A protein has these predicted regions:
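Active-site-adjacent helix/loop patches that line small-molecule binding or acyl-intermediate pockets
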Residues: 3-35, 88-206, 222
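A short, well-structured edge-of-sheet supersecondary motif
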Residues: 31-67, 276-279
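Glycine- and acidic-residue-biased ligand/ion/polar-headgroup-sensing regions
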Residues: 81, 503, 511-513
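Cyclic nucleotide-binding regulatory module and flanking cytosolic helices
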Residues: 19, 451-509
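Active-site SXXK
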Residues: 61-62, 75-97, 219, 287
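The feature marks cytosolic C-terminal regulatory regions of anion transporters and related permeases
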Residues: 317-413, 417, 423-427
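Structured C-terminal helix/loop/strand segments within mature extracytoplasmic catalytic/sensor domains
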Residues: 3-7, 12, 226-257, 262-333
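Short acidic-hydrophobic, aromatic-tinged amphipathic segments that line or gate anion-handling sites
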Residues: 439-448, 452
């Protein structure tokens, strides 16, 4: 098997990302929960280790987050069905495929022999009858060429070369009597054509393809990215049919749990009895999970819990209204390139020119939700090693949901652990509408925040007599630089000392000189 090639997106501190931390927290919550039972109707599946548990999330632009046993290999099983449906659409187009396989939920078990007698076709491509009919549509000259096409297409989706677990394939082939009955029943009614045994072998083989939770997340991210694999940049599925695939996943992808899944979690998804679940948030990311113990509906028990937590925590329901992501970081710069309006002495200027780059400013814009915040957090973790103070300006942020407030609060805590300070400007007391208070440095605008950061840097380097509001000796004043001691002493005799209380106005712009 070829090694995976993940693009270098520059995020060197991925473990510090609040998104990675959230995935880690969710994984830890269910790691020791062994509810459910491993599938046993296929002998090879019964050998699965119930303790293995992996979670991966891949964004539509290729950032990979993975936790636990995310690289453990298992067989796709029914997760292969929506993709083969997409391949059939590429081969024949929508109208022809619809004439052979419907798109309506059946209300029956995934291995039901019940067919749509009115239209003389299986109800949908997610039940076994529909999946067998879909596989029968895959073009190629003979079994070997058709199998090579399927493996090649799945490898394009995963961004690496995939293989078949021949032990599982042989086990499925030896025990797949019900599927054989379905195949020959479909042949009898003219739903599929010969060679039936070849179609069935291909179906058993596609279900036996080895993948990991990470692979599933990449495949899901490919669907989220309109069919373009975000790791390789290769088109793995024609963009015209991505919507069709996601639609059938949304309505029929989770067996008898499909309706409740749509109601509670709201993401197009597909599960398999091998323990995998794949879920997609179009335009944003894909999720892959693996845990072999299944619930009563045949879905991974831990996988369902992970997706529920992610959807609730990050407000991911597909029907939740949100604006397009766009560019969220309007501009960024450092404190040595953009200074506050506060006038400084030449010695202070020298310090700030030298150390000002440790002040980092991000001006944000648009709508903040999971997809846009992930990009902001990635930028933060990429640059974190080079700054001590981070200013996030929210002046141009139009809307922010609860997820963005929670992620920002976690970011502040993470930066604090790294001995760095987060400053927010133009930020409401309660960020978003969640009531989650982000208890960190707040300022009215960027200039005030820059001045505060500059003061911190100056306090770290200035002489002791400049700290704590102490009086500056005359020789240290910029205006007297170049004068010798006798001249300074003479000037001191003619100066008049005046004292002002804190907050007292010394001079106003426009006053007479």
């Amino acid at each position: 098997m070829q090694p995976r090639k993940t693009p270098d997106l520059g995020c060197r501190n991925i473990d510090l990302s609040p998104i990675h931390a959230s995935l880690k927290e969710i994984h830890a919550k269910y790691r020791d929960d062994f509810s459910g039972n491993v599938a046993t109707y296929i002998p090879e599946l019964a050998k699965a280790d119930p303790s293995l548990f992996g979670v991966a999330l891949v964004t539509a632009d290729g950032q990979v987050y993975e936790i636990g046993d995310a690289n453990h290999l298992f067989t796709m099983q029914s997760i292969s069905k929506p993709f083969v449906y997409g391949f059939a659409l590429e081969d024949h187009g929508v109208d022809h495929v619809l004439s052979k396989v419907g798109v309506e939920p059946s209300g029956e078990a995934f291995n039901s022999i019940v067919l749509d007698e009115r239209h003389n076709r299986p109800f949908n491509p997610m039940v076994n009858a529909g999946a067998i009919a879909t596989t029968a549509l895959i073009k190629g000259k003979g079994h070997d060429q058709r199998l090579a096409r399927l493996l090649g297409k799945f490898s394009d989706l995963a961004g690496r070369s995939l293989e078949i677990d021949h032990g599982v394939y042989i086990s499925e082939r030896a025990t797949g009597h019900r599927n054989r009955a379905i195949g020959y029943l479909e042949l009898n009614f003219g739903m599929i054509e010969e060679p039936v045994n070849e179609h069935l072998d291909l179906y058993f083989e596609q279900c036996s393809i080895l993948v990991s939770a990470r692979d599933l997340a990449v495949m899901a991210a490919t669907l989220a990215n309109n069919g373009i694999n975000p790791l390789t940049g290769q088109c793995a599925l024609d963009e015209r049919y991505v919507q069709n695939v996601l639609s059938i996943m949304h309505s029929c992808g989770m067996y008898d749990y499909a309706g409740e899944w749509s109601y509670r979690i709201g993401l197009p998804a597909k599960s398999g009895v091998g323990g995998g679940i794949l879920a997609v948030l179009p335009g944003q990311f894909g999720v892959g999970t693996f845990s072999a113990p299944l619930d009563d509906q045949g879905n991974s028990w831990r996988g369902i819990r992970v997706c529920e937590e992610l959807s609730e925590r990050f407000k991911l329901h597909m029907l939740k209204s949100r604006s397009a992501a766009g560019v969220v970081v309007r501009c960024s710069y450092r404190g040595n390139a953009m200074r506050s309006k506060r006038r400084r002495s030449s010695s202070e200027d020298e310090i700030l020119n030298r150390r000002g780059a440790t002040i980092c400013v991000f001006e944000l814009q648009g709508t903040l939700f999971f997809g846009t915040m992930e990009r902001v957090l990635r930028r933060i973790t990429e640059e974190m090693a080079t700054f001590s103070y981070l200013i996030l300006d929210l002046k141009r942020v139009l809307q922010a949901d609860e997820c963005s407030a929670a992620l920002l609060s976690q970011t502040a805590a993470m930066l604090n652990q790294q001995q760095k300070i987060l400053l927010l400007t133009h930020c409401p007391e309660h960020f978003g509408n969640s009531g989650e208070t982000i208890n960190h440095e707040r300022f009215a605008d960027i200039d005030c925040a820059l001045e505060w950061c500059e003061d911190q840097l100056l306090q770290q380097e200035q002489p002791e007599w400049l700290r704590g509001g102490r009086q500056i000796p005359l020789p240290a004043m910029d205006i007297l630089q170049g004068f010798d001691p006798s001249e300074i002493a003479l000037i001191e005799t003619i100066l008049l000392e005046k004292r002002y209380h804190a907050g007292q106005i010394i001079i106003r712009e426009g006053d007479s000189a």
